[in-house]
């Protein structure tokens, strides 16, 4: 539901500025320039720091290359998908293009540090040979004081300087890649969040918040690591492998041939392992998403769980998800263990073979001790590079698996495009017409909500939609806000179909207050001014009037910090009535031409409800339209017209409250009588209101 609230105004834009400014993220003018955070252009508040809890993602549209799908699928591709990851790998490197010069600098530093490392075996071999030669010479004929044409002091001084250069290059490489990786993660997360906020309600309704959080956090980190740190390690392994192989060939081509006999088995094992680990990685990330989803649900519903004593059941449910993650992790551990154990055995066998052949060559005089020592060290470097390349490939496959999940969301085009269409100049003084509207929710296609529904709401009316649960009252609001498109028919403002409007700008002209307002973690003032245009937010008198219209003044006076009181996550530190009044204050401050109230006064006391009703009546006098969805008599009687919906979403009667209540057998009277009967049996049983909506 919070996604819908964001979309009513500048929410997606605000979120991107809060999450990370795109211009700063994509800029590479300075490597150490962190992603910037735009400040809200509102003088009265601290920049927003909202925690957006989104309904998660699993729906995949058939849309390809901008063509609209007629049958969107409801699930992302299977976690066990065996499709090639090379396309995803290519996209990984395309994604890192803005950081290419820093990655290139890091690779140059790798070349420097690797060159220093690869010089060590040659130096050690030379020292060993010189030491063995000096044993057979007298002091006068000794040449052991000369190393590569330098005296010992000069040589070791130069060697120390080279080692320092190598250390600085290695440290610089690590710093650059860490910073580059963080920038890449920030860019990827911002794009993914933008893609999530642009999705249609059908997509969001059928998917899990935990899965989305997993894509934003762990998946994005894995992807960034695979094209920064992992590429660095792979490059280092390649350099060591080529240099090591070259030096081995220079020292002894016979021993090199012995070493290379074992290379093909290592390559084959690495290829098989990489493919296996990619699929396991994707399964693991999907399972982690499911685990996060369960944890998010349980933490949000803690009070309900405790009220019904469901702690043990929920712990078992969470433990089941933990076991799923554990079993996949176990498979990954066993696969990795078998691979590295096998390659280790192959490597040790190779080293033993080299020692056997090498010692025989020393005995025959075709190789010195120093040369064999250097060869063995280069063999270790070359073997390590093979292991490094195997690890590089497996990590790259992990990145491909995570990238597939992230790109899957980024590539998904919403069925309802939020930025296409003409700008609606104004909705004031325009009738709202539901013309032959038929609708079923995409997630429940067999359950008909509306069939040939016809409603006309005149400008300046306060219309109240009533009816039994499931009659489609709240669906009217969802269709007006175009969370969903109708199956047939049209919804028009004046003579213009709302599908022709730029959706994002259209929603900014409508006020919307839900039964259970979802407040952001911040101050009360932050929430009242959420998405309010700066020119309105700067008017202190207008803010005070809006607070008074929603009857917030009294309870705000009881808070020591007043408007600067923190509301907590999802408004947890406020009562239901206080949250509704804050949401109403936001709506009154915006003062839209069309205001939709979905059970927006259900938690208010009678005094607050009367104050709100009087201010809604003033909207009618000014020619503004209000649409209320309600069950309570106190709300219904203040409307100028009542629309009674039947069980199958049809209009069974319409008229003023006084006219309908005066008809003894009217549907409105029947609904109220049923409510009174329920009160006589122990209280009003209102299914729409009795369920705690912990969404």
UniProtKB/Swiss-Prot annotation:
Family the entry assigns: Belongs to the ABC transporter superfamily. ABCB family. Mitochondrial peptide exporter (TC 3.A.1.212) subfamily.
Listed name of the protein: ATP-dependent permease MDL1, mitochondrial
Amino acids binding ATP: 467-474
InterPro entries xref list: AAA+_ATPase, ABC1_TM_dom, ABC1_TM_sf, ABC_transporter-like_ATP-bd, ABC_transporter-like_CS, P-loop_NTPase, Type_1_exporter
Disulfide bridge positions per record: none
Organism: Saccharomyces cerevisiae (strain ATCC 204508 / S288c)
Domain of life: Eukaryota
Main localisation: mitochondrion
Swiss-Prot/TrEMBL GO biological process terms: oligopeptide export from mitochondrion
Note: Present with 1040 molecules/cell in log phase SD medium.
Transmembrane segments: 103-123, 156-176, 242-262, 337-357, 372-392
Keyword Ribosomal protein recorded: no
Domain ABC transmembrane type-1 residues, every copy: 103-398
Membrane topology: Multi-pass membrane protein
Transit peptide segment: 1-100
Role this protein plays: Mediates export of peptides with molecular masses of 2100 to 600 daltons generated upon proteolysis of mitochondrial inner membrane proteins.
Keyword Transmembrane helix applies: yes
Keywords, comma-separated and alphabetical: ATP-binding, Membrane, Mitochondrion, Mitochondrion inner membrane, Nucleotide-binding, Transit peptide, Transmembrane, Transmembrane helix, Transport
GO molecular-function terms, A-Z: ABC-type oligopeptide transporter activity; ATP binding; ATP hydrolysis activity
Record localization: Mitochondrion inner membrane
A GO-annotated cellular component: mitochondrion
CDD domains associated with the record: ABC_6TM_ABCB10_like (cd18573), ABC_MTABC3_MDL1_MDL2 (cd03249)
Domain annotation ABC transporter: ranges: 432-673
């Amino acid at each position: 539901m919070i996604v819908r609230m964001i979309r009513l105004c500048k929410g997606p834009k605000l979120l991107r500025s809060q999450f990370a400014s795109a211009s700063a993220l994509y800029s590479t003018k300075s490597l150490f320039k962190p992603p910037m955070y735009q400040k809200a252009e509102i003088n009265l508040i601290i920049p927003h720091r909202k925690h957006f809890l989104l309904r998660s993602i699993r729906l995949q549209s058939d849309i390809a290359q901008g063509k609209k799908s007629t049958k969107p699928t409801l699930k992302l591709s299977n976690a066990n998908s065996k499709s090639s990851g090379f396309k995803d790998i290519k996209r990984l490197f395309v994604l890192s293009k803005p950081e290419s010069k820093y990655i290139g600098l890091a690779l140059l530093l790798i070349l420097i540090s690797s060159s220093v490392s690869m010089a060590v075996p040659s130096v050690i071999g030379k020292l060993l040979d010189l030491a063995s030669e000096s044993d057979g010479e007298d002091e006068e004929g000794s040449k052991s004081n000369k190393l590569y044409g330098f005296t010992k002091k000069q040589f070791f001084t130069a060697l120390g300087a080279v080692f320092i250069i190598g250390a600085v290059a290695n440290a610089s490489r690590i710093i650059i890649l860490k910073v580059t990786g963080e920038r890449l993660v920030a860019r990827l997360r911002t794009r993914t969040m933008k893609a999530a906020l642009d999705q249609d309600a059908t997509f969001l309704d059928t998917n899990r918040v935990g899965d989305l959080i997993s894509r934003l956090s762990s998946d994005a980190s894995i992807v960034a690591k695979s094209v920064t740190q992992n590429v660095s390690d792979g490059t280092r392994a390649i350099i060591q492998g080529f240099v090591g192989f070259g030096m081995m060939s220079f020292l002894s081509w016979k021993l090199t041939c012995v070493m290379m006999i074992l290379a093909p088995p290592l390559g084959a094992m690495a290829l098989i392992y990489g493919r296996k680990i990619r699929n396991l990685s994707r399964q693991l990330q999907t399972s982690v998403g499911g685990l996060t989803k369960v944890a998010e649900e349980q933490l949000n519903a803690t009070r309900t769980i405790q009220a019904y004593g469901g702690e043990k059941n929920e712990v078992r449910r969470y433990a089941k998800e933990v076991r799923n993650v554990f079993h996949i992790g176990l498979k990954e551990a066993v696969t990795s263990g078998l691979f590295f154990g096998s390659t280790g055995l192959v490597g040790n066998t190779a080293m033993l073979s080299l020692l056997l052949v090498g010692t025989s060559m020393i005995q025959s005089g075709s190789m010195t001790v120093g040369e064999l020592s250097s060869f063995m060290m280069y063999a270790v470097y070359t073997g390590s590079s093979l292991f490094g390349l195997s690890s590089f490939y497996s990590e790259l496959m992990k990145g491909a698996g995570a990238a597939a999940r992230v790109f899957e969301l980024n590539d998904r085009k919403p069925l309802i495009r939020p930025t296409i269409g003409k700008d609606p100049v104004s909705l004031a003084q325009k009738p709202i017409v539901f013309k032959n509207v038929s609708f079923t929710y995409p997630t429940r296609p067999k359950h008909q909500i509306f069939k040939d529904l016809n409603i006309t709401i005149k400008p300046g009316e306060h219309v109240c939609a009533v009816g039994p649960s499931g009659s489609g009252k709240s669906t009217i609001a969802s269709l007006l806000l175009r969370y969903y498109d109708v199956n047939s028919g049209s919804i028009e403002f004046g003579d213009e179909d709302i599908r022709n409007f730029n959706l994002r700008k259209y929603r900014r002209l409508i006020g919307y207050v839900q039964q259970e307002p979802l407040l952001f973690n911040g101050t009360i003032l932050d929430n009242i001014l959420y998405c309010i245009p700066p020119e309105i937010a700067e008017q202190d008198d207008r803010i005070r009037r809006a607070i008074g219209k929603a009857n917030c003044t009294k309870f705000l006076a009881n808070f020591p910090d007043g408007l600067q009181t923190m509301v907590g996550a999802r408004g947890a530190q406020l009562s239901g009535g206080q949250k509704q009044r804050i949401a109403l204050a936001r709506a009154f401050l915006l003062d839209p031409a069309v205001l939709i109230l979905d059970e927006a006064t259900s938690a208010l006391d009678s005094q607050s409800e009367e104050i709100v009703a009087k201010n809604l009546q003033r909207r009618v006098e000014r020619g503004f339209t209000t649409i209320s969805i309600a069950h309570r008599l106190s709300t219904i009687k203040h409307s100028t017209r009542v629309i009674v919906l039947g069980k199958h979403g049809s209009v069974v009667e319409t008229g003023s409250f006084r006219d309908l209540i005066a008809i003894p057998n009217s549907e409105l009277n029947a609904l109220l009588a049923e409510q009174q009967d329920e009160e006589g049996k122990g209280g009003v049983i209102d299914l729409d209101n009795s369920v705690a909506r912990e969404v």
